[in-house]
């Protein structure tokens, strides 16, 4: 599919800010001020009601290995963006949705998964940020979970992350074989009990690659429990990052939406 993530009048969200028209800027200001007055639940409900006007760009079918090669060709043709070298600091805004929270809550585990899993890994060859560099993400990172969709995520956050945030030593077997989680998975709308582990593993590469991960605007206690550093503003985050990358770092911003694959040279 293409990258038309937002219909009118929200298409400005998929544009680079310097491309905004006067109308776009007006819509942004009006939307921001309105959203700031609403409770989180209402804001989520409004965002999830937006239907993307996606269109199909290609269809592949047949033998898996052959289809995979052809699919990659089309993905690279559509999404590949050439980037000149790695950066010291990578900034990115984490959206309100991920593959695992449609009509649901973007909980702290999914913030980690979306940032250090999906967005960090959207590259070919090597990551946008150098090894030992700093990743700065912006997201409110509320300690909020959907009890029907993500019951094991709640326990993962309270129980597992209180013990460790190193996926190599986590207690996956207990969650995978828990009968109550299995029951909810089979009879309700819950993800499997082991799902938060896989979400965490998906972000583990980015977590291990970066020298420091900072979340701007996140609830401080929640951010620290994830193993990251909280910051109130982007300026604060850059000051914190200077301890890792020095006072004159290179900075790259991954603008989402749209979706891209960085081809780092």
What are these regions (language model features)?
Residues 1-86, 117-121, 127:
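Conserved, well-structured core segments that form the ligand-binding/active-site neighborhood
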Residues 104, 109-213:
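C-terminal catalytic subdomain
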Residues 88-93, 136, 252-253:
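Structural motif
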Residues 3-5, 94-96, 141-143, 257-258:
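Glycine-rich beta-alpha junction loops
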């Amino acid at each position: 599919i293409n990258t038309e993530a937002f219909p009118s009048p929200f298409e400005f969200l998929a544009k680079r800010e310097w491309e905004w028209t006067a109308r776009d800027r007006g819509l942004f200001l009006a939307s921001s001020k309105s959203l700031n007055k609403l409770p989180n639940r209402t804001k989520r409900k409004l965002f999830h009601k937006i239907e993307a006007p996606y269109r199909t760009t290609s269809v592949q079918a047949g033998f898996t290995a052959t289809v995979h090669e052809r699919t990659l060709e089309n993905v690279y043709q559509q999404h590949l963006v050439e980037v000149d070298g790695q950066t010291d600091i990578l900034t990115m805004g984490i959206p309100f949705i991920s593959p695992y929270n449609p009509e649901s809550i973007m909980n702290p585990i999914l913030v980690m998964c979306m940032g250090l899993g999906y967005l960090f890994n959207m590259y070919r060859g090597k990551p946008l940020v150098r090894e030992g560099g700093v990743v700065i993400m912006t997201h409110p990172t509320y300690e909020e979970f959907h009890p029907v969709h993500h019951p094991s995520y709640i326990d993962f956050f309270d129980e597992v992350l209180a013990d460790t945030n190193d996926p190599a030593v986590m207690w996956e077997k207990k969650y995978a074989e828990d009968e109550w989680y299995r029951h909810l998975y089979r009879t309700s709308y819950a993800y499997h009990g082991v799902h938060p582990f896989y979400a965490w593993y998906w972000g583990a590469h980015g977590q291990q690659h970066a020298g420091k991960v900072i979340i701007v605007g996140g609830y401080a206690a929640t951010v620290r429990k994830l193993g990251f550093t909280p910051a109130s503003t982007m300026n604060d985050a850059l000051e914190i990052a200077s301890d890792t990358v020095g006072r004159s770092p290179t900075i790259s911003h991954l603008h989402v939406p749209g979706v891209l694959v960085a081809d780092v040279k």
